[in-house]
A protein has these predicted regions:
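Extracellular and organelle-lumenal recognition/adhesion modules and their flexible linkers in secreted
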Residues: 1-154
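Long, low-hydrophobicity ectodomains and other hydrophilic envelope-associated domains
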Residues: 334-335, 340-539, 556
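C-terminal beta-strand-rich structural cap/linker in extracellular carbohydrate-active enzymes
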Residues: 557-578
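Substrate-binding cleft of secreted/luminal carbohydrate-active enzymes
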Residues: 220, 275-313
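Conserved, mostly hydrophobic/aromatic
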Residues: 60, 187, 216, 290, ...
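Exposed aromatic-hydrophobic patches
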Residues: 59, 98-104, 525-528, 559-564
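Short, solvent-exposed loop/turn and secondary-structure capping segments
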Residues: 71-73, 128, 139-142, 209-210, ...
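Glycoside hydrolase catalytic-domain groove-lining segments
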Residues: 146-153, 160, 167, 174, ...
Length: 578
């Protein structure tokens, strides 16, 4: 049946009559306002059974009130809504025109749909729509190898034969391989460059090509800004205001399955973009997780895009220079990852991705993004328990059982990392080591155990917080030395008005607000495993200098540390004496 999709922003109407060519039924759609995402509104016909590898021909007549274009595709009519390799752009004008597309689905499905999508404001009409098995695919009229008239293959081409797809991939692969290895030899052999060299981030290029260089690199963003209209439009964008702690693995597992066993691995771009209200979780979580996985480098993208290094406010999606909540936990990130407080996994798992298996994936998908361990049999959630990677050679591995689909608690094989989603939409993440500890997540009235330290909260604005603790120069939290505590919640600029777009989407458009930045003071209590008389608590100023000491109380033989908004700070020094 035909379906017409509109979200709460789209304004569009549709009707069916007999005013098509020669009195045929005509579908007319008038769009007044586009939806919140680029593909909305759209209409589709679902319930189709498609057989993978078999040709189908889609035909229809179309016209519009002005020269316009829209997209068509074949995809699942159900979760996970995957497309089948057919995706084309239809151009229309005021005259009825016939359109014919022959395509071969890359997989079969019993409930597929043909979608007409991305309708911008205007009037569109369709008639004589049909989808039939069969059709001729291959060279277009007038094309031949002898005449050298075969056009460059476009990714959006829908009439590629299997041989054409494979020839095209083989050509791209050899061209790219020659480029990367040629540049590598030039840099190393002719220029005599001594540092290690990589090509580009994995997934921009096949794994085996990039693994021929010195190390593997990858990028990832938790809910990168989306631009429904014009790319990078400063007034038309949104981010999903979601917390990673509610999605076990998330971007972290997505990075883990791109690692190559036996090679150095860096993540040279990572961030949880502003104005996501939970962005403080990002760098501490990847620091702990990356150390557990045994990664070699993690880079924030970015500290600054310009020379205004101390703006005193959040200035953009990615620049962390003015964001207290993302900066104040960096000492803990350094301790967990660089100092090595978080221990590497005890067990490393890998799946073999041979050159032949990689090439088969490229033939099928035309995408290097599909060359990840999870597409070769490794459940990405295993990365929450053990180190994971792709092996360049080898036989299929015997992998341990994956966590149950309904699993809600994940404990690393070192027992130092704990991820809990036992309460709906109230996940939390803990890293617990002898010299550093991290909590980030939703509170819900719970008390959290960080080893022999108990952490409980008062009321916070989001019922969420991030707290990091670092033994700066002592051997642990019950030993003499200085401890650094950072506690953050909601942050925003003055005059920053967050606009709720629905479905978890938020924006501030181009109204980022002004300095100084406003930070929530977290109300929390820590119970340290030392006598209160051995402990001094100092709220710190913005430069990290001690302010007047705050009282420390005794509670059942332990030191009771109280963090409170009255201290007007997000970090504290704790001195543990002999």
């Amino acid at each position: 049946p035909w379906q017409f999709e509109r979200d709460d922003q789209a304004v569009a109407e549709w009707s069916v009559d007999n005013q098509g060519p020669d009195g045929q039924p005509r579908l007319r759609v008038v769009v007044t306002r586009q939806g919140r995402v680029a593909w909305n509104p759209q209409f589709s016909y679902a319930g189709l059974k498609l057989v993978g590898g078999e040709p189908y021909t889609l035909q229809f007549l179309a016209r519009s009130d002005e020269p316009r274009e829209f997209g068509i595709n074949a995809m699942m009519a159900h979760d996970p809504w995957e497309q089948f390799g057919f995706n084309a752009t239809v151009k229309t004008d005021r005259q009825w025109q016939s359109h014919r597309y022959t395509f071969i689905p890359n997989k079969g499905d019993a409930n597929a749909r043909i979608s007409f999508t991305g309708l911008k404001p205007g009037a569109y009409e369709l008639a004589a729509v049909s989808l039939r098995p069969g059709g001729i695919v291959g060279l277009e009229p007038g094309q031949s190898l002898e005449a050298e008239s075969v056009a460059i293959v476009r990714r959006s081409a829908v009439n590629l034969t299997k041989a054409a797809r494979q020839d095209w991939i083989d050509f791209l692969y050899s061209t790219e391989q020659d480029y990367w290895l040629g540049m590598y030899r030039f840099i190393k052999d002719e220029l005599k460059v001594r540092p290690i060299v990589s090509g580009t981030q994995l997934s921009y290029s096949p794994m085996h090509i990039q693994a021929s260089l010195d190390y593997i690199d990858a990028h990832s963003y938790w809910h990168h800004p989306a631009f429904p209209g014009r790319p990078w439009d400063s007034r038309d964008w949104y981010v999903q205001n979601a917390a990673l702690v509610n999605t076990p693995g998330g971007t972290l597992s997505g990075l883990a399955v791109r690692r190559v066993a036996g090679m150095a691995y860096t993540v040279s771009e990572y961030n949880h973009p502003a104005p996501i209200q939970y962005a403080a979780e990002g760098f501490p979580m990847i620091a702990a997780f990356g150390a557990f996985q045994g990664w070699d480098g993690i880079f924030s993208f970015a500290y600054s895009h310009n020379t205004d290094f101390e703006p005193g406010k959040i200035s953009s999606f990615f620049d962390i220079k003015g964001d207290t909540s993302r900066m104040v936990h960096m000492p803990a990130c350094a301790a967990m990852f660089l100092r090595g407080d978080v221990a590497p996994a005890r067990e490393a798992l890998s799946v073999a991705v041979t050159p032949e298996a990689e090439r088969a994936t490229l033939y099928k998908t035309l995408s290097a993004w599909e060359i990840t361990a999870d597409n070769y049999g490794l459940d990405p959630r295993l990365s929450l328990l053990h180190a994971v990677a792709m092996a360049k050679e080898g036989r299929p591995a015997d992998l341990p059982a994956a966590p149950a689909k309904d699993a809600v608690q994940f404990v690393s094989d070192t027992k130092q990392i704990y991820w809990d989603v036992s309460q709906k939409d109230a996940g939390y993440f803990i890293a617990n080591t002898p010299r550093s500890k991290l909590f980030t997540g939703f509170i819900r009235g719970r008390t959290f155990k960080l080893g022999d330290i108990a952490l409980r909260f008062g009321k916070t604005r989001l019922d969420w917080a991030t707290v990091s603790l670092v033994a700066v120069d002592g051997e642990g939290f019950d030993k003499p030395g200085r401890l650094l505590v950072a506690a953050t919640g909601q942050v925003e600029n003055q005059g920053m008005t967050i606009e709720d777009l629905g479905s978890g989407r938020i924006t501030v458009r181009d109204k980022w607000g002004d300095a100084p930045m406003l930070c929530e003071g977290i109300e929390a209590e820590l119970l340290l495993p030392v006598a209160a008389e051995r402990v001094a608590l100092y709220p710190l100023d913005e430069a990290g200098n001690r302010r007047e000491a705050a009282p420390v109380a005794a509670h059942n033989g332990k030191a009771r540390i109280v963090l409170a908004p009255r201290h007007k700070t997000v970090w504290y020094e704790i001195q543990v004496r002999e």
